[in-house]
């Protein structure tokens, strides 16, 4: 059974993913000693067949209302944390290991009030592509960039029927994503069924 490290294991999508048939190791900020910006708090793991990085932010506001520390916090969670994890566990990854990162549709489409998150997630996609080329053929890296998915983190964006309808109508399929939609894609990318896919978003 593949051994998979999940970073941000308390997220709703992560909880759905953990119903799949993998041997999961969980890291979450709810662990008192774990700090995504401090690699000395990362547990030692000898071997891994895969890694999924979930930590993210939903910090939407007009550009004029952002403070420097808002951008900094979003970048730390979305990008620097990912870099720290990848650097720390690179040598633990087995041959043919698979890494899945999480971006957002906002990284590639201009959306109002998304200045900070779009910048951060574009960085995640660029890093994923770069490392996919650098770490091939031993390790595969792919990124998922979903539209809005119903989770606790996004519930303030969908907490009325009017809000939900507006968001649904913007999507070609006229519906909001569910956690299982993303978990199924991650499961596929972690599996050998995607063994000829790397560097994709």
Regions found by a protein language model. Give the residues of each.
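Residue(s) in the substrate-gating loop at a strand-loop-helix junction
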Residues: 104
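Substrate-binding pocket helix/loop in short-chain dehydrogenase/reductase
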Residues: 62-63, 70-75, 163-167
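C-terminal substrate-recognition "lid" of short-chain dehydrogenase/reductases
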Residues: 175-201
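Active-site loop-to-helix junction immediately N-terminal to the catalytic Tyr of the SDR YXXXK motif
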Residues: 66, 110-118, 130
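Alpha-helical segment proximal to the catalytic Tyr-Lys
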Residues: 91, 132-137, 195
């Amino acid at each position: 059974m593949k051994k998979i490290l999940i970073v941000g294991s308390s997220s709703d999508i992560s909880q759905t993913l953990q119903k799949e048939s993998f041997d999961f190791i969980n890291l979450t900020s709810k662990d008192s000693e774990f700090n995504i910006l401090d690699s000395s708090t990362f547990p030692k793991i000898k071997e891994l067949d895969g890694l999924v990085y979930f930590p993210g932010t939903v910090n939407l506001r007009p550009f004029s209302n952002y403070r420097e520390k808002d951008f900094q916090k979003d970048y730390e969670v979305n990008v620097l944390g990912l870099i720290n994890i990848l650097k720390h566990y690179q040598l633990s990854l087995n041959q043919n290991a698979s890494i899945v990162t999480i971006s957002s549709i906002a990284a590639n489409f201009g959306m109002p009030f998304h200045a900070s998150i779009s910048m951060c997630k574009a960085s995640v996609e660029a890093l994923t592509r770069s490392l996919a080329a650098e770490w091939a053929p031993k390790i595969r890296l792919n990124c998922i960039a979903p539209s809005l998915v119903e989770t606790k983190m996004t519930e303030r964006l969908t907490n009325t029927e009017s809000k939900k309808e507006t968001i649904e109508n913007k999507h070609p399929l006229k519906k909001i994503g569910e956690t299982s939609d993303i978990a199924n894609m991650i499961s596929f990318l972690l599996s050998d069924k995607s063994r000829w896919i790397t560097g994709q978003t």
